[in-house]
Amino acid sequence: MTNDARERIEVQRTIPASPAAIFRVLSDPQGHVSIDSSGMLMDATGEPVGAVGDRFVVHMDREALNDYPMGKYDVTVVITTFDRDREIAWTIEGQIKPPIGHVYGYTLEPIDGGTLVTSYYDWSSIGEDWRGAGIFPVIPESALRATLGILDRTVRRAT
């Protein structure tokens, strides 16, 4: 992955909770639905993940974004990085073949008073066909930032 600002977005927030409490939400398929700021994630099917290669299905509805007429569809989340209580990342497999190759993830750093959470979206590994499509990033920085706020609220309610 790259830190090139043109191919990666990162946002941070301090959450007054332990990395373990935050990671529990991030490794649970229902946690992904709970913290989604886009309104696209409707539900998820699968068990909490515990390793690279683990998968779960997310039931989506793109109508919330009002951008592409995709309707309801499913994607499979495939875990690409799993370092318990430190980092989790995933890519998406869905209707588009081969998969696009963009990656979503979180890093967790314990600090005084809680955890510094970094949410990132990286599209540095997408194919050339996708680079020219002009649709990346598919989510704005504001959506990542909003998701961190919802994650904060979700973790506080769970503890």
Predicted segments — roles?
Residues 1-52:
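Hydrophobic ligand-binding cavity/cleft-lining segments
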Residues 11-13, 74-81, 92-94, 102-110:
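Hydrophobic/aromatic beta-strand elements that line small-molecule binding cavities or substrate pockets
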Residues 6-12, 19, 55, 74, ...:
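Intrinsic-disorder/low-complexity, polar/charged segments enriched in Ser/Thr/Lys/Arg/Asp/Glu/Gln
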Residues 122-159:
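A conserved amphipathic terminal alpha-helix motif
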Residues 44-93, 153-159:
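Glycine-rich portal/gate segments that line the openings of hydrophobic small-molecule binding cavities
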Residues 91-99, 120-127:
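Short, solvent-exposed aromatic-acidic interface loops
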Residues 22-26, 32, 56, 79, ...:
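Hydrophobic pocket/interface hotspot
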Residues 16-20, 47-51, 80-87, 107-116:
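A short, structured loop/turn motif at beta-sheet edges
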